[in-house]
Amino acid sequence: MNLLNHFLIAMPSLSDPLFQRSVVYVCEHNENGAMGLVINKPIEDISIESVLEQLEIFSADRDSAISLQKPVMSGGPVAEEHGFILHTPVSGFSSSIKISDSTMITTSKDVLETLGTARQPEKTLVSLGYSSWEKGQLEREILENSWLTVEATPQIIFDTPIAERWHKAAELIGIDIHTISPTAGHA
């Protein structure tokens, strides 16, 4: 089972406050474990603009028509001081990995310097921190009914309102997440 480019959808019974009602986009999954970004937990009072100001990134070619008031997500509890940018594919950044035909992840400062300019990727999601699982941990959590999984779509990452992402991700597999039994078992 390889969950790269999949969503992990928290089951209603998942009570961990870090992951309750969360949707995690899996950026890496291999024999050593998994890494992903929560895409529906905005950090209160932190926008892309405030992050750029704090990092003293001021682009000379800033386009005032491009809003930087989008919220920054809490990608997870690991390395919360590090930024991770999901975006539509654009080449030329110094530290990028193509996850799918529609999504890349970049961790280098050069992508931040394009935000708010005509050079920025068409669609972006900025997060601080990430989520990780040790070898076999995610698979165990799935078997314990903590997560549903479904192949990711860029529409949910980039276009769906944040408050609707949990529900909409579950709809991809035909489930109304609000009516699912929290005590699902194994056949």
From Swiss-Prot:
Coiled-coil stretches noted in the UniProt entry, renumbered to this chain: none
InterPro entries: AlgH-like
Protein origin, superkingdom: Bacteria
GO cellular component, one term: cytosol
Family: Belongs to the UPF0301 (AlgH) family.
Protein name: UPF0301 protein PMI0339
